[in-house]
């Protein structure tokens, strides 16, 4: 299913395996996903990064008609459909989080996002923005979905001090006022000396401080963290 075209001629498709015995497209998605994740030291170590959830989930694919290449993809699933078919255990996020019973409304009217990637040769060329445009096009067709949620990772390739800073900053500025999910493997509590780096009064000041501290460590804020926090 075609969801639209970008201003520079790329095409956004929606694809699902639907029980096909042979799925060369899924194999290619897994190969490119592994390449992209290895580039930020998050690779699985396998030839292809695929799992059982790929068989059921929808895949939003950005296609380059000129290069005949997959630019990137986002995996997502209307959660009510998957829960009806497989139970809550059929959701990827459930393997990472315990759900509160109050999560039910979100599961009934939500879409789980995850496993996004842009292959390295297309980094810095609006690929992630185009994928978000595709998600927007899907929501325009199915406006009864009210929530987007899903896990986002921090690269294990970042220095421990950088990971601590990121966790402390986002816990400070984006806390869960009504927690609906709890991590099965929670990150340790932020140390006082890390929290002391941020004033907690002015978001822009603290964000500037975070960027400076990460820059001193030779890294930056992961792109998805930037996009998700801007949406908030």
Please identify what each model-predicted range represents.
Residues 74-80:
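Short beta->alpha transition motifs characteristic of CBS
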Residues 66, 77, 117:
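Anionic group-transfer/hydrolysis microenvironments
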